[in-house]
């Protein structure tokens, strides 16, 4: 009897090709399209360029997913997780921005929606043995450690293990990643060869399941903005006014709107209580560098005691944003939920609220939220 795989069929090229490959491998395949955002229900008006369109991008995605399912002769189911997305992902996203932190909704979306709500629905309602996604990542079972390992994809430029760092053993044991050993070019080539409607569709960008938005306007739907001073961190001189401290991220250069300056300025720090945005000039970029950070809400994907000699302090690599090169670090345990991450060399623009993701070579160990940056 064939094993059944339910694929998160999003209407994009990656999940389309994932379906095709699983069929080629002999699985029984069905698609499941998720709708996780409703602009009307969620007051998504400001910054939404699609608000007056006859057909919203999500509905077009569903039509594309349906066309792919029809072409491959598989069933396509549809499910709404609009409330769950709001409760588990978007509420946290907004609360973090209120604190002038910079969260990563894609990581939460994977943890709570794609690999939790979706996974449970596929197994309990559709009788799936596995789920599959169009992510670029690998899962392998290590017979020595008896752990499911999340491993970087063959195409390092597309590797998405950073966004999967909050997953657990149970989720990995039920997940297939058919694109693990393919490049994006190979995926598009397969889609073209199979005449899939999504072959030349551009990759989705913007906020997970919400899409492209004018970000400043979008946040104004949910958080009142308050102007304040822009201050040179070196001289303490007021240089101008910011439009709301939450709209800026550490290391940002564009959009600060300081006119008449002899050189570009970068966002260096934020004082939430005083509503001050601190900036530094290009010649004072040392203010952007830090030597370590504190992280919390740690998630170890696997039993790290089987991978490092001392779980209280060990060397590994880390990424502090997507597509960043791996950095050598020492991870020191403070308590079960708090760790200090010490950098082998100072790193630029480490941002509170973002995710620190830890690796041993190509194996993703897990991730944690950056809570404090130490200069």
From Swiss-Prot:
Protein known as: tRNA-specific 2-thiouridylase MnmA
Gene3D superfamilies recorded: Adenine nucleotide alpha hydrolases-like domains, HUPs, Translation factors
Location in the cell: Cytoplasm
Feature type site, description Interaction with tRNA: 135, 354
Annotated keywords: ATP-binding, Cytoplasm, Disulfide bond, Nucleotide-binding, RNA-binding, Transferase, tRNA processing, tRNA-binding
InterPro entries with a match to the protein in the record: MnmA-like (IPR004506), MnmA-like_C (IPR046885), MnmA-like_central (IPR046884), MnmA-like_central_sf (IPR023382), Rossmann-like_a/b/a_fold (IPR014729)
Catalytic activity: S-sulfanyl-L-cysteinyl-[protein] + uridine(34) in tRNA + AH2 + ATP = 2-thiouridine(34) in tRNA + L-cysteinyl-[protein] + A + AMP + diphosphate + H(+)
Function: Catalyzes the 2-thiolation of uridine at the wobble position (U34) of tRNA, leading to the formation of s(2)U34.
Lineage: Bacteria, Bacillati, Mycoplasmatota, Mollicutes, Mycoplasmataceae
Coiled-coil portions: none
Organism listed in the record: Mycoplasma capricolum subsp. capricolum (strain California kid / ATCC 27343 / NCTC 10154)
Disulfide-bond pairs as recorded: 109-208
Alphabetical list of SUPFAM superfamilies matching this protein: Adenine nucleotide alpha hydrolases-like
UniProt GO BP: tRNA wobble position uridine thiolation
